[in-house]
Amino acid sequence: MTQLAVPSPAAPTLPDLVEIQRESFLWFLREGFEEELLSFSPIVDYTGKLELHFLPEYRPGDPSKGYKINKPRYDPEEAKRRDATYQAQIRVPTRLINKETGEIKDMDVFIGELPLMTDRGTFIINGAERVIVNQIVRSPGVYYKSELDKNGRRTYSASLIPNRGAWLKFETDKNGLVWVRIDKTRKLSAAVLLKALGLSDSEIYDSLRHPEFFQKTMEKEGHYSEEEALMELYRKLRPGEPPTVSGGQQLLESRFFDPKRYDLGRVGRYKLNKKLNLNVAENVRVLTVTDILAVIDYLINLEYDIGHVDDIDHLGNRRVRSVGELLQNQVRVGLNRLERIIRERMTVSESENLTPASLVNPKPLVAAIKEFFGSSQLSQFMDQTNPLAELTHKRRLSALGPGGLSRERAGFAVRDIHPSHYGRICPIETPEGPNAGLIGSLATHARVNQYGFIESPYYRVENGVVRKDLGMVYLTADEEDEYRVAPGDVPVDAEGRITADLVPVRYRQEFTTAHPSEVHYVQVSPVQLISVATSLIPFLEHDDANRALMGANMQRQAVPLLKPDRPYVGTGLEAQAARDSGMVVVSRTSGVVTYVSADEIVVRPDDGGDPIVYRLQKYQRSNQDTCLNQRPLVYAGDRVVPGQVLADGPATEGGELALGQNVLVAYMPWEGYNYEDAILISERLVYDDVFTSVHIEKYEIEARQTKLGPEEITREIPNVGEDALRNLDENGIVRIGAWVEAGDILVGKVTPKGESDQPPEERLLRAIFGEKARDVRDNSLRVPNGERGRVVDVRIFTREQGDELPPGANMVVRVYIALKRKIQVGDKIAGRHGNKGIISRILPIEDMPYLADGTPVDVVLNPLGVPSRMNVGQVYECLLGWAAEHLGVRFKLMPFDEMHGLEASRLTVEAKLREAREKTGKDWIFNPEGKYCGKIQVFDGRTGEPFDQPVTVGRAYMLKLVHLVDDKIHARSTGPYSLVTQQPLGGKAQQGGQRFGEMEVWALEAFGAAYILQELLTVKSDDMVGRNEALNAIVKGKPIPRPGTPESFKVLVRELQSLCLDVSVHKVEVDSDGQTRDVEVDLMADVSSRHTPSRPTYESVTSEDLSPAAGGTFTLARRSREEDEDREEEDDF
């Protein structure tokens, strides 16, 4: 049973949370693509006799005359399985007109393939789900800025920024002159530009409100005629070329008045008209003379304190580019390339034989779209750890990417929270680290309007009464500045009258107070200003913002558990977050369930149509190796309504988000095991699979065509015993259901090897006996170090089955291995309030502290983690969860509950605890009096004695995060070295070593551990000769020789020499007569004038030594050094 703890005003259900992705892509299909095609139509050849028109009979709103999309070859599921892209072919009606003969050819032409969006707002590219992140960029338009020069005089500048094309910047200087820069080039007088545009003095003066200011500029530079001004313009922009009037004219035309080269965009025109009070038509996307005069007029007015300068971080000046627009820009790039190709073909080919199909080559457009989806910074591998991660990824706003900022150049101002973010961009959810503030998340109720500006909804307030009956009004940041807006948690009575005497309001970006009668608008919900992830944190208002940020980010890293468990204390948004994430199955119609199995649900609709079959995902692997599994919630015969959840997905229970588990926590220190945020847990969490999750890993191998012949997937692997092959079938592929450990063969593969690959002894044997040993080497796919599990699926791809394989591959085999991971020491768990920690010890149940009724606690947290971090929300949650458990209910609390009275959270929790105590009759549950209010007596499990002080105990919601110790633990004995520095590589994937850095070296220096330090910097790292000899010495039990010169020192010497610095190394020798002289040492020559570094030589036992003829005694034969050097194997030590 779920109970709303506080009778909150029914929060309006949130809008569709993935709308931003879907709407944008639909706009691209409906308008964006056609808009681009029409902007390139017609394409005329250089002589002007051939014309190619796209969409010749296009009429807005009539789809029959537009382009056509064919049915995709695969559906999304099939595309994923085949590693294909979910895309459709596009055909465009074209018309080729031959002006000489008057001949007209109409044809539908294939122009390329477009990846389609799935109904969850994602794209499937080469079998992987990807998301296009929304980009937030500076809006085109005009921006005014003021600066103080070094003499303290204020100067103003205006930048005219188009969507694409040249920037135009006007500036005033200390002498009161107006200058202009075109594309950041040299300064040019504004008078010259205006004269070059063909304006007379009187026209210029008439259009300015303060012509006297411009007079100085005209007197100094305004004596040019139009021709002279054009010559002067050409001289400034193209210095070094002979100026001509026509050249200047053409330069000006192409820079600002040619729609191909200059485009303000719809937004730019809208912003320009709004800022300068113009009424130029919206379809005029290039600059006009009126625009330029108005910009100069506004600039001059600023000198007279009329108008105001702009704040570039205000959300009225930043807009969102979603999928549709990013894709449209990419299509433009492709069509630009296509246009060049078409023109060339028109010129080269015979005009009689030309058809539109022979002119249009789909390759450039396909390449541009592929490049965007495959390698753009904004096309990201979807974060599928859990439903919330997926949802947040689709709502992310990034200031990075093409046309945006870069991490290095972004200052503090851009990253900072701006008052206009309120209700539009979440002030809390952003990454920690270099991207802080550059990547944000859309607020819960925000939406993006047709121009790309973020809007937030409000209710009107008239004479202090909230008019919900009038519906919601969406305002952009610009519009909102003019009104007094109250937050969503102002107290109102039943009639909607605001009851407070003074209300906090936002007005012109200031946070002030106002009388209810002065308020214009009120927000629709208290969670309007935060994002979805943040709004899932209960008692958010009691947490410090830094910790709330960690809490929001860590919920996205929670691993879906085996047995999902909804939180006892939630915020009421869990159901919608789960539904909109696309991981649960939602009914499309009302009807009756006729059939339910683990794999599918069949619903018979009420309108009598065909039964609808909902297929469920079973144990699929997600992008993050977690397990996607859907479980039915309905039974045959149940009635369902549209929007009802039919099946749970990963990390959901009963259609609500369930990222973690409700566990019994006690806040107390325990033998130092929870020092520094470490966490002590009970063995019960392991045995009862409370924090157990399923992970599915994918391993892949391809059999390629090599120069020496094809690689073969087979069971016949050289030098491998039958025991290692026990799990393989007759083709050498592991069977489904086999349990495999690290090093086991998954797929047997042999590669042909040439003459050079064979060691000398094998060559010798073949020379003597002439026998043809199988010249193949083992190249099988094995389970990597530290991995294990059960094989759950094997997929084989071959060309014969019609699969598309990478070039050079004959066959691809993919093996999926699943593993149940129980919680263990080293795993990271966290609450929703930024309280995270690593498990330090798992105690037996009998040793855990226990309560008065004998219940052992599950988790022991350190109480010192609360005061300094200021995330007190966790204490409220833990105590309310304690009450919820005893009352048998779940609570839903909207954050920001002060509208229900002062200290509403504390009073609510206290009231519920009292209720639980009275209802259950257990007095020890809650101690209402004195300084121990809310704490209870806890007993030591080892001794049975009560602890000295009462302890805070309750039910908290804890998440297991994806940072699992199994994926991180790593050790290296011998492994690969870097080619240049010869130092060990780093990282688990490269089988790397641990970096002994600068500071660690200082620590050993300070301690005086000279020999350990020398070993670390030479033998254990990059002294090639030394490390081989050390290995030999260890194998033979001899003393380790002295270290030599590190390779990185030689690299340093070589780099200095490459800068023409004569650097060499000398050593001092003492002659027999006591004289000293220094001798140059050649570091590059090898110790014993050998060219190759020595390899380790082992004492090895040969088969002859073991033969009975030798008397069965062991003699040790040693392979010679020369033989060693002949082995051209990779130096893997």
From Swiss-Prot:
Polar residues biased stretches: 1090-1105
GO-annotated biological processes: DNA-templated transcription
Superkingdom in the source lineage: Bacteria
Region (Disordered): 1085-1133
Major enzyme class: transferase
NCBIfam families: PRK00405.1, rpoB
Family: Belongs to the RNA polymerase beta chain family.
UniProt-listed HAMAP family: RNApol_bact_RpoB
Protein purpose: DNA-dependent RNA polymerase catalyzes the transcription of DNA into RNA using the four ribonucleoside triphosphates as substrates.
Protein name: DNA-directed RNA polymerase subunit beta
Native organism: Synechococcus sp. (strain JA-3-3Ab)
